[in-house]
UniProtKB/Swiss-Prot annotation:
The gene is Prrg3. Residues 1-19 form a propeptide. Residues 20-78 are extracellular. This is Transmembrane gamma-carboxyglutamic acid protein 3. One of its GO terms (cellular component) is extracellular region. The modification 4-carboxyglutamate is found at residues 22, 25-26, 33, 35, 38-39, 44-45, 48, 51, 54, 58. Keywords: Disulfide bond, Gamma-carboxyglutamic acid, Membrane, Transmembrane, Transmembrane helix. Residues 102-231 are cytoplasmic. Residues 140-165, 184-231 are annotated as: Disordered. It comes from Mus musculus (Mouse).
Length: 231
């Protein structure tokens, strides 16, 4: 059964469908010569494209030789249509990963300060710590009561910041004014000098009469001296 169609209807039926690389064909329109060199073409496909027997035979005579011949160097530019988009996508991915890494690093450094900042904060906190001094003495003040005078012999703790005033605190948690601690320190006797410490001290008459160079007393002398002491 023969079917005859007009030219317009025949072109509609025998239309050419796009290949898998339709996107690249939109960038660079292909020809039958390049397509047949990239793929294996049949005689019917070439005939449908040229729609002319003379042109079809002319192409078909040279086609077997073109399959095994070296391709034109200009056709190597077709690979650029594949390589350039892939490189662009890879570059965008690398830039996005770098931006994400920088954001994460800034968040980490914001929550955890650096080692230098930690040392600065630690040294600054160490300077603000209070100083504690424990001493014994008696508080002398006109406005102090008798109960305070009796408790003056107890150990005292002086606390105060390194840069501010000092306060005096008793072990029984009794607070005194800073002036009392200052008066205590001003009225305290100075320590003895080296000459006073090394000078020979005068003892009692009994200690002076004893000579350590004499021999010890005998047993008879001790026994004779004990009855007289009992009497």
């Amino acid at each position: 059964m023969a079917v005859f169609l007009e030219a317009k209807n025949a072109h509609a039926v025998l239309k050419r469908f796009p290949r898998a690389n339709e996107f690249l064909e939109e960038l660079r329109q292909g020809t039958i010569e390049r397509e047949c060199m990239e793929e294996i073409c049949s005689y019917e496909e070439v005939k449908e494209v040229f729609e002319n027997k003379e042109k079809t035979m002319e192409f078909w005579k040279g086609y077997p030789n073109a399959v095994y011949s070296v391709r034109d160097p200009s056709q190597s530019s077709d690979a650029m249509y594949v390589v350039v988009p892939l490189l662009g996508v890879v570059l965008l991915i690398v830039i996005a990963l770098f931006i994400i890494w920088r954001c994460q690093l800034q968040k980490a450094t914001r929550h955890h300060p650096s080692y230098a900042q930690n040392r600065y904060l630690a040294s600054r906190a160490g300077h603000n710590l209070p100083r504690v001094m424990v001493y014994r003495g008696t508080v002398h003040s006109q406005g102090e009561s008798s109960g305070h005078r009796e408790a003056g012999n107890n150990p005292q703790i002086v606390m105060g910041p390194s840069r501010g005033g000092r306060t005096t605190v008793r072990l029984e948690s009794t607070l005194y004014l800073p002036e009392l601690s200052l008066s205590r320190l001003s009225s305290a006797t100075p320590p003895p000098s080296y000459e006073e410490v090394t000078a020979p001290q005068e003892g009692s008459s009994e200690e002076a009469s004893v000579s350590y160079s004499d021999p010890p007393p005998k047993y008879e002398e001790i026994v004779a001296a004990s009855p007289s002491a009992d009497k």
